Amino acid sequence: SAASDVYKRQLYACQSDPVTQKKSRRRLWGCTALLLLAALLSGSIPAPGMQNCFYVILPFLGELIAAVSVVWAVVKLGRDWSAVREYVYERTVPALPGRALCAAVFAAAGILCELLYLALSGHGGQLFSALLFVMLKVLSLICALTIRRKLKCLNWAKVPKCENQ
């Protein structure tokens, strides 16, 4: 019956006006896509250290896992922020800033570790790959910090029960 299809638990809604909400959603989705793309691309170029150096590879793996986690949460949050179910809200909105920070920390570690590798071992004729790798890590870092900042600025509130039914 239609009555049993009504969601009984709490709903949450973003309190921004529709124009701000749309802009925030676009920026969130765009930064999330760029974060994942930059992480994937940085792992697919032959940068010095990425073939045989654990302290360059490990931050990349951490960043990739964190980026996938951010993507999962953003997709789960969806595009309609006017009525987000409680279990979706709890697994996405409060968790996303931490996940984005995790991706940012691993991207920053990737930059530092690649620079350390270059200082200790040189670029081995792959200067372009090394520079591209570092630039992709910088892009990941910027995207992750932007995601974190945007989500922390959004105000979410419970939808009153009378509107929920």
What is each model feature region?
Residues A107-F133:
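Alpha-helical transmembrane segments and their membrane-interface junctions
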